[in-house]
C-alpha cells in the first residue's frame, strides 16, 4: 500500500482544478476561465487498491506585487514543503515565459520529485514543439513529462501510475470514502463564489468573497444564508444587477449545484454587502487564503 501528497502547481487557468476534479471524480475545486479563481490550498483525495493520493490544488502562479497575490504565492510555497511530489501543469496553448522559468527554478531548488504535465493535448493549434524544446533546454528529461487532457481524461491513468511509482509505502491518511477534507461551509461558499464570477466582469473575482451566515441541515434539506462581500459600491451594483436579475441568477445556479453535490434539497438566500477595501486588510486576506 502506497500513499503520499502531491501538489498541483502551474500558471492560472492551466487546468489544475480540472485535473483535481477529474481524477477524484467529484467537484472539489471551483473552475472558471477567469485566472486565479483558486485562492486556497484545496485537498482532493483519490483512493484505490494501490493506496491513496492526496492532491493539493494551489492558486495559479503569477508574478505580482499586489498584497492578495503575494498571500496566494505564499500558499504555493508552503504547499511545496508539504508534499512528496510536485505536479507542474503547463497549458500547451501558452508560450513559455517568465512564470515558467521561475516555477521551474523553484521546483528544482526544492529538491522534491516532480512531473511536468503538458495539458490540453486534445486541442489543436498548440505550442507543444516550442514547450518541449523549452523543457529540453531546462534539462527536463522525457521520463518526467506526461501529455494529458485533464478535461477529457487522456492519460490520467498513466499519470496515476507515475504518481504511485514516486510514492513510498505508507498508510491511508483518510478513510476510503473521503474525496476531500474540506468543511461543508467552505465548499458551499466556494460554489457561491464560482457562480458569482462566472458571468461577471473579470476584475470581480479579486474583489469579492463569500461568508456563510447560517447553515442548517433540516428535514427538508439544507437551509443557507450567505453574504457576498464586495470592495466598492459599483461592484455591488454589478452583482445585484438590474432589478436583482444577476443575484437571482447566481442564487439559482448555486442552489442547483449545491443540491446536486450534497444530494439534498437546498434553500439558499443571498445578500450582497459592501466592505470597503477588504482586499487590503491583512487579517481578512490571511483568513480567506488559509
UniProtKB/Swiss-Prot annotation:
Keywords: Cell inner membrane, Cell membrane, Cytoplasm, GTP-binding, Membrane, Nucleotide-binding, Ribosome biogenesis, RNA-binding, rRNA-binding
InterPro entries membership: G_ERA_dom, GTP-bd, GTPase_Era-like, KH_dom-like_a/b, KH_dom_type_2, KH_sf_prok-type, P-loop_NTPase, Small_GTP-bd
Keyword GTP-binding in record: yes
Main location: cytoplasm
Record-level Gene Ontology MF annotations: GTP binding; GTPase activity; ribosomal small subunit binding; small ribosomal subunit rRNA binding
Region (G5): 148-150
Domain Era-type G: 2-169
Membrane topology (UniProt): Peripheral membrane protein
SUPFAM superfamilies named in the record: P-loop containing nucleoside triphosphate hydrolases, Prokaryotic type KH domain (KH-domain type II)
Subunit structure comment from the entry: Monomer.
Family in the record: Belongs to the TRAFAC class TrmE-Era-EngA-EngB-Septin-like GTPase superfamily. Era GTPase family.
Protein name: GTPase Era
Organism: Borreliella afzelii (strain PKo) (Borrelia afzelii)
Gene: era
Amino acid at each position: 500500500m502506497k500513499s503520499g501528497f502531491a501538489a498541483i502547481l502551474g500558471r492560472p487557468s492551466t487546468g489544475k482544478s480540472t485535473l483535481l476534479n477529474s481524477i477524484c471524480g467529484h467537484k472539489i475545486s471551483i473552475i472558471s476561465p477567469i485566472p486565479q479563481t483558486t485562492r486556497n490550498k484545496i485537498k482532493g483525495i483519490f483512493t484505490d487498491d494501490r493506496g491513496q493520493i492526496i492532491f493539493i490544488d494551489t492558486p495559479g502562479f503569477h508574478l505580482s506585487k499586489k498584497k492578495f497575490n503575494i498571500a496566494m504565492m505564499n500558499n504555493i510555497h508552503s504547499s511545496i514543503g508539504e508534499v512528496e511530489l510536485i505536479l507542474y501543469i503547463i497549458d500547451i496553448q501558452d508560450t513559455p515565459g517568465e512564470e515558467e522559468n521561475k516555477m521551474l527554478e523553484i521546483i528544482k531548488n526544492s529538491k522534491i520529485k516532480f512531473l511536468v504535465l503538458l495539458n490540453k493535448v486534445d486541442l489543436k493549434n498548440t505550442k507543444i514543439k516550442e514547450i518541449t524544446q523549452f523543457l529540453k533546454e531546462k534539462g527536463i528529461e522525457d521520463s518526467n513529462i506526461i501529455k494529458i487532457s485533464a478535461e477529457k481524461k487522456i492519460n490520467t491513468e498513466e499519470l496515476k501510475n507515475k504518481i504511485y511509482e514516486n510514492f513510498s509505502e505508507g498508510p491511508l491518511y483518510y478513510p476510503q470514502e473521503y474525496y476531500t477534507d474540506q468543511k461543508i461551509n467552505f465548499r458551499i461558499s466556494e460554489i457561491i463564489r464560482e457562480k458569482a464570477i462566472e458571468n461577471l466582469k473579470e476584475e470581480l473575482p479579486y474583489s469579492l468573497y463569500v461568508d456563510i451566515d447560517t447553515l442548517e441541515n433540516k428535514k427538508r434539506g439544507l437551509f443557507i444564508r450567505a453574504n457576498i462581500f464586495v470592495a466598492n459600491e459599483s461592484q455591488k451594483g454589478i452583482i445585484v444587477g438590474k432589478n436583482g436579475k444577476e443575484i437571482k441568477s447566481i442564487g439559482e445556479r448555486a442552489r442547483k449545484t449545491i443540491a446536486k453535490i450534497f444530494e439534498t434539497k437546498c434553500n439558499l438566500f443571498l445578500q450582497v454587502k459592501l466592505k470597503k477595501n477588504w482586499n487590503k486588510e491583512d487579517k481578512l486576506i490571511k483568513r480567506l487564503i488559509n
